[in-house]
A protein has these predicted regions:
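GAF sensory/regulatory domain recognition
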Residues: 1-17, 21, 166
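Signal-transducing coupling segments at domain and membrane junctions
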Residues: 8-12, 32-59, 76, 268, ...
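Sensory-domain boundary capping and coupling elements
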Residues: 26, 60-78, 100, 292
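Short beta-strand-to-loop transition segments that serve as allosteric relay/switch motifs
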Residues: 42-44, 55, 71-80, 176, ...
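A short, aliphatic-rich beta-strand micro-motif
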Residues: 55-64, 84
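… and, occasionally, acidic/histidine-rich disordered N-termini of signaling adaptors
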Residues: 109-289, 339-355
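C-terminal catalytic subdomain
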Residues: 208, 228, 281-290, 295-355
Length: 355
């Protein structure tokens, strides 16, 4: 037992303060799980002296769900001091104290668990951030910017850049169903799969087809993911795109912004799936925007969606800006639209502008 002792002001406690759970009057109450009244401690062999003035003692176990979590112990300098009234009153007090002590213990345990969880989540956030590659610094003939905002510490949105060579780049954006740690882990698996396929220099439709098979083999808790994948060929200025259920990418070209209207099944649901591929030759100033549904489907306080139309108008209005400026303008406008409300969904954005 760990002892907490109160005596009269100015008096010292002498004697043994450490004891096994079965020793002394306190130990007897704990062992028997019932009150122990000792009228004269000097004739009771179980007594362990703490205060030489003690003549009688009352020990009442504090029980919680049939388990002794402590003992309420009172000592008196008078012989035969404690009565049945003391036993009844203090038994009620001991029961209430037991509940309070257990609640305090559970609160402390909860606080420790929450602190550990927070440390784990922060570590997961750092790891996830490290998995997302920065925009390439090599000259692929594109200005690029990527933005990533999580509704929680970690999320299921992802983007990736695959270097196919000095002239060719793969660009991906994906969204795992659900949120939180499980979605983030599944997203990390998807990034690993893409990187393992990169040496094959797969074009978009074939990349999504192979990812669908590999993601499906590693499906966790019924999760799936949407993804959009594109390849860019510098020199030829050729863009190829395929889509697996992701928000349709946007393309600013010839003075207007429109959707690249490609559809396809999300990855990891059906085994044998093929994907359509669309290609276009781009010119300087053309802009490609990949975006997760957390942008267009963001709602304001009046239950209005930000919407793809608003997003396309923004791109048209700021088409002369850099890729970085366009990405920042989009996120600022979404924040303004929602009055800076907390994120209800992850927001991920990749902007590529042809130099």
């Amino acid at each position: 037992f760990r002892h907490r002792v109160d005596v009269k002001h100015g008096h010292r406690v002498q004697g043994k303060l450490r004891a096994n759970a079965s020793e002394g009057i306190v130990g007897a109450a704990a062992t028997l799980k019932e009150p122990v009244v000792v009228p004269d401690v000097t004739v009771d062999p179980r007594y362990l002296m703490v205060n030489p003035e003690t003549r009688s003692e009352l020990a009442i176990p504090m029980m919680h769900k049939g388990k002794v979590i402590g003992v309420l112990d009172l000592e008196s300098p008078q012989l035969n001091y404690f009565t049945e009234d003391h036993v009844q009153t203090l038994s009620i007090l001991a029961a209430n104290l037991a509940v309070s002590l257990e609640n305090a213990r559970l609160y402390e345990q909860l606080a420790r668990d929450e602190a550990r969880l927070e440390r784990d989540l922060q570590a997961a956030k750092r790891i996830q951030g490290a998995l997302l590659r920065p925009v390439p610094t090599e000259d692929f003939g594109l200005e690029m910017a990527a933005r990533y905002l999580s509704a929680r510490e970690v999320c299921g949105d992802l983007y990736e850049f695959l270097r196919y060579g000095p002239q060719q780049l793969g660009i991906a954006l994906g969204d795992v169903s659900g949120k939180g740690t499980a979605a983030a882990l599944y997203g990390a698996v998807a990034i690993g799969i893409m990187r393992s396929l990169a040496p094959q220099k797969l074009q978009p439709a074939e990349m999504l087809k192979q990812m669908n098979q590999l993601v499906g083999e590693r499906r966790i808790e019924g999760r799936f993911m949407t993804a959009c994948f594109a390849t860019w060929q510098k020199g030829r200025q050729k863009l190829r795109v395929a889509n697996a259920g992701q928000s349709q990418p946007l393309l600013y070209k010839d003075g207007r912004c429109g959707k690249i209207e490609l559809t396809g099944f999300p990855l990891g649901i059906f085994e044998e799936v093929s994907y359509d591929e669309w290609s276009v030759t781009l010119e300087s100033g053309n802009i490609l925007v990949f975006h997760s549904d957390g942008i267009a489907e963001t709602m304001n306080g009046e239950s209005q969606f930000f919407g793809t139309t608003r997003l396309m108008k923004l791109i048209e209005q700021h088409h002369e800006a850099s890729a970085t400026e366009i990405a920042d303008v989009i996120l600022r406008e979404v924040d303004w639209f929602t009055q800076n409300a907390p994120l209800s969904d992850d927001r991920t954005l990749v902007v590529a502008k042809v130099r």
